[in-house]
């Protein structure tokens, strides 16, 4: 699993720096996307998932945009993302990085733990699961 504190992956031995650089790039792209999301209208989790259901071949960019525009609702508080390029991670970014890594590793126990620890509402939890899973399936195109 990805550890943002020391930027390593516990599952890899030789590719730790590659995985940490890869996750930093993903989080940094999400930071850039968040800047544009702030000027767009808020979107409910329900609306975001319905839009994706119309075209299930949506890109990772669309999933990421939907996540960033709805995560405030799911968490019950504003999402904290640092400015693009910053080396330190916010608590929300660490949580998101761990969640993405867990999806990529198909670590369902950790996925459940991470979602249960931050998203109280069961319906919202399932929406976030759907969105993060969609993002992680095509994350390299982000």
PLM regions: where:
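C-terminal-biased regions
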Residues: 1-142
């Amino acid at each position: 699993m990805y550890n943002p504190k020391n930027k390593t992956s516990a599952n890899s031995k030789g590719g730790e720096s590659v995985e940490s650089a890869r996750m930093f790039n993903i989080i940094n792209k999400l930071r850039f996307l968040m800047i544009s999301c702030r000027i767009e209208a808020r979107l409910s989790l329900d609306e975001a998932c319905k839009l994706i259901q119309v075209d299930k071949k949506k890109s990772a960019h669309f999933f990421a945009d939907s996540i960033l525009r709805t995560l405030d609702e799911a968490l019950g508080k504003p999402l904290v993302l640092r400015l693009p390029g910053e080396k330190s991670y916010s608590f929300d970014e660490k949580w998101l990085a761990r969640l993405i890594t867990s999806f990529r590793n198909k670590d369902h126990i950790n996925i459940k733990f991470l979602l249960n620890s931050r998203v109280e509402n069961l319906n919202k939890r399932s929406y976030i699961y759907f969105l993060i899973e969609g993002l992680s399936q095509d994350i390299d195109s982000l």
